[in-house]
Amino acid sequence: MREGSFPRRTRLLCLLAAVVLISTVTSFNIDTKNVVLHHMANNYFGYSLDFYNEQKGMPVLVVGAPEAETTNPNLSGIRRPGAVYACSVNRPTCREVHVDKMKGNLKKLNGSHLVPIEDKAYQFFGATVKSNDKHDKLLMCAPKYKYFYSKFEVIEPVGTCFYAENGFEKTEEFSSCKQEPARHGRHRLGYGQCGFSGAIPGKKNQDRVFLGAPGVWYWQGAIFSQNTKNQTDRPNTEYGSKEYDHDMMGYATATGDFDGDGIDDIVAGVPRGNDLHGKLVLYTSKLKMMINLTDEVSTQHGQYCGGALAVADVNKDGRDDIIMGCPFYTDYGSVKDAKTQERKPQYDVGKVIVFLQTAPGVFGKQLAVVGDDQWGRFGHSLAAAGDLNLDGYNDVIVGAPYAGKNKQGAVYVIHGSKDGVREKPTQKIEASQIGHGTARAFGFAVAGGVDVDGNGMPDIAVGAWKSGNAAVLLTKPVVTVTGATEPESALINVEEKNCDVDGKLGKQACRHINTCFKYEGKGDTPNDLEFDLRFNLDDHSPEPRAYFLQKDVKSDRSIKVASGSKTRDHPSSIEQRVRLEKGRQKCFRHRFFASSTMKDKLSPIHWSVNYTYVESKSGKLRGDKLEPAIDTTVPLSFQNKINIANNCGKDDLCVPDLKVTAVADREKFLLGTQDNTMLINVTVQNGGEDSYETKLYFDVPQGFEYGGIESVGADGSAPACSPTSDEPDSDGKWTFACDLGNPLPANKVVSSVVRVTASSDKPPLAPISINAHVNSSNDEEAHTIADNKVTFTIPVDFKNQLSLNGRSNPEQVDFSMTNKTRSDVFDDNEIGPVVSHLYQISNRGPSEIDAATLDIFWPSFSTEGGHLLYIITEPVVNPPNKGRCRVKQLQNVNPLNLRITNEHVPTEPPVAKTPNEYSREEDDESYEDETTTQSQTHHQTRTEHTQHHQGPVHVYERDEDKIRQNTGNWQYVEDKKKKGDYEYIPDDQEYDGDDFEDDDEDFDRAGSKRVKRAPVPKKKKKEGSRSGEPRSDKARFSDLREAVKLSKEAGGVVDYKGPLSRASVDCNGLRCTHIECDIYDLKEDEFVLVEIFSRLYTNTLVDERNPGGDISSLALARVTSTKYNWPHKPTLITAVSTNMNAIASEEGRDLPWWLYLLAILIGLAILILLILLLWRCGFFKRNRPPTEHAELRAEKQPAAHYADTQSRYAPQDQYSQGRHGQML
């Protein structure tokens, strides 16, 4: 079966259902063009109405206007007593009926004065107008009529009614609630409002009327059976217990035979009964209680069931059925919100319940018809309309006074049927269709059952009190059309081209279809009528495969191309106007051809023929007769089909055996790799008979994009594939359909490769489900369908390997334990040799790393607080577009403000940047600005200092007090918007002396001995750190030492699960420097180098008599983010160590130069004094003996040695650009 389609049998059933639906919706025979519309303004004209035969065979429409000023001379001077009008059914004329023969208000002697005992002002006369089934008796009531009881002190609305027979000449007044002596009061009959509703029995029981009085006995309500010939014969229903208070029984009444005795009984509506659900109470003609009827279909509080009533035999079983209105019913299930698809309540749509009498006194079946317009109050009024369409079943009209356009009101026609009533109204008449469309509250009152124009069809009347209208709507006669359409032959072979279509298409396969019609009439129907026929070829197919011949259309003037035809040259739909004679069949013959290039050669070619009656603008025929209406209880169209010849054998049934297999080119899909394409090998095989319109369907999983399909093998081309819809399904999957053949022959194998590519924006994160299935337009046998579908799952993984390496340059530094540099140094090269630690963090793949962190803990100070590895510059990151570093304790970078000689800077040219790297630098502009701001915070101004030195030297002014006192540190602090800056934090907020109190060794010099130091005094602890984290979460010095030890024992990098992290290590109290580096966008085999340059502060080693050992920095690296939030692997740690080698002391001492000069001068002075003394003594004047040759040995003097810092501690080879520029 094809994706998204139904089997042929199912589609045919759907078509038949559509035909029934069309007949249900469009059927009507109430004429809206020739309406007799009566109008009177501002008096509630149309509040009630009914037909009444004033004279035999001469019906009038009696309309109540309960707010009217009467023209009755007997009621002169009484304000708005109300009036009843007799209106013509043929033209818009009315006259008031004077039924009250009493002169004004009745008066009675009260002492010596005559005083009124009644009040007819505002009595609402005309609120109830009701006739019997034969429409020869009439009841007219004033429910607000007031009576003054015997003491003249109590005035209560007892209500009154007038009864007429055979005209209006003789009338009787009945006020059943007006009873003496003293039955007044709300607890009795005083507020009864007799005549609020009324009903006149039609079967036997001819001398009585039933009056509803909903206000008696605390508004429990009652029914009075008033004898029309005896005023005092007026029995009523009994008083109930207080739980029935305010039920308002008698709000509506109707009569019918409910016990099978042939005498009309009474049914009363109780809209507030049954806990406000509403109910009906049935009494016999003698007012004996029979049964209660309640809504069992969809009951709800406040629906006001029983607010309107009608009685009719709707299913023609000979028993009277009851129709009950529930105008305030709310529909919670029919309407859905267009966006959310949630069901929306439709308030006050109203509904009608039909109680079918299945046996005498037994109502065993309920049917419900629900309104279609919110606030419309469908079921506010009801009337038995008779058999409107002459199908043998009585119909019902329902008023909805606030439905339709602009809430002006509407009337619905519900047809009876053998099952009761039809599920939906057959006609909806809106106020906008009547007259000029000005009626309001149209449908507040309805009446029917009288043929007023003599065409044998009962007509209806509708009241609209808000606009003061009453309308008489005539019923049109009914025309029933029967017919059939048949093919010339049962098959068409598209390869047998037997007719010439045109020069372009040449010859094609042609066939004829024959269609026959005739009509019969119900009522006064004409002998001949015009109909429009519409022929639709191949109307089951999205694209037609069969067409009418253009030359045939042009040759017949009665035929034209139908509007909506998908083609014009050779149309698939045509229209033809024909004239039929009543009772005579007429046939038509049309030729069509089937396209030889059609794809679907298995499905039959269906066609349909629809017919409609051609109406005139006036809606009338010759002789001023109403036009007929089409009977929609029979189909409005006829259908048939013709099969296409194929290779399916004698049974004309091809049964394929399709099978599909699929396999992916990988067992696991890795995210974040360069290769994001997956291939799915799909093979389809047909092991049965020919498979027509064979299609392969496969799902492109969520997170993938379709990349095309290729055929495997040299004998076939790639199938054409396209998505089945414009949007993915609810799971984000796209379904593609591929044509594999029409037909796909038996034993044919089709192999294809589907390429899908993972989306870069939203790649797959869950296991990938691969679904594929194959289908065709012909059905397979049930036991072979299982292999038409294949489903398998491919797991998704994310795999990257973070690598961390480091080394020291140089690996060993020699220093002398006896030689110190001078303390007043100014250049960085005077404090000791350069020591740099280089770290490399890399991704060994295969998946990408979105973000990683590298945290380096640097040994800036010794245990005694002296400078150790003195950082001279901020860390160098290479390549700069892959990471950035910041020193958290920025004051530890060149804290003595020495001139940086830049001897550590390599001389090689910088690494060339790609355009993408320049783009990255532009993106990081905000970070550079931040860094500049930090730098300006600590180095606010720069001046050039040239005293005692050659060339410019940069000196930075700092907060000397803070640096000298070492009372605090600079920390990087982020606000809520993730923007940050460095702030100065005093030590008393961060430092905790407990971190060192029990430690004997520093992590940067593991294994070396030192002089025991004095304990550091403890400072007051804070409850928490600046970030709000508890102090117990901070790492201790021992954690750093153990991490260094762990790395050394492992000989390099180690997976670390200890307490150290970026947040837990606080270098402010551990005499270290925390360097935070953020690394990003590392693809496979990419790396980042981070190098920290420092100088070994040799004076600290000499002062602390350190015999040597290792100085170590510690680095932590971890993946913090991937593109797909995959679980991260453990943290890596490694320690980089520099060995300090203490060398033996040299002879001599380093003495100041002035001591040497002083010694020379003293020696010279002594020599001069000695010469003068010898000269004075005449030493040089004595006779000298002969000269002897002798060797004078000079006295040994201690050699003076001077420390040359640059030559001893900073050999030139340590500054070679090769060593400091080399990368691992």
Swiss-Prot record:
GO cellular component terms given for this protein: external side of plasma membrane; integrin complex; M band; striated muscle dense body
Residues bearing attached sugar chains per UniProt: 74, 110, 230, 292, 610, 681, 775, 819
The keyword Transmembrane is annotated on this UniProt entry: yes
Basic residues bias: start-end ranges: 1008-1023
SMART domains documented for this protein: Int_alpha (SM00191)
Compartments reported by the entry: Membrane
Topology Cytoplasmic: residue spans: 1175-1224
Membrane topology designation: Single-pass type I membrane protein
Family from the record: Belongs to the integrin alpha chain family.
Protein task: Required for muscle development probably through the regulation of the actin-myosin cytoskeleton. During the formation of neuromuscular junctions at the larval stage, negatively regulates membrane protrusion from body wall muscles, probably through lamins such as epi-1, lam-2 and unc-52. Required for distal tip cell migration and dorsal pathfinding. Required for egg-laying. May play a role in cell motility and cell-cell interactions.
Subunit structure, as described in the record: Heterodimer of an alpha and a beta subunit. Alpha pat-2 associates with beta pat-3.
Protein name according to UniProt: Integrin alpha pat-2
Organism: Caenorhabditis briggsae
Gene name as annotated: pat-2
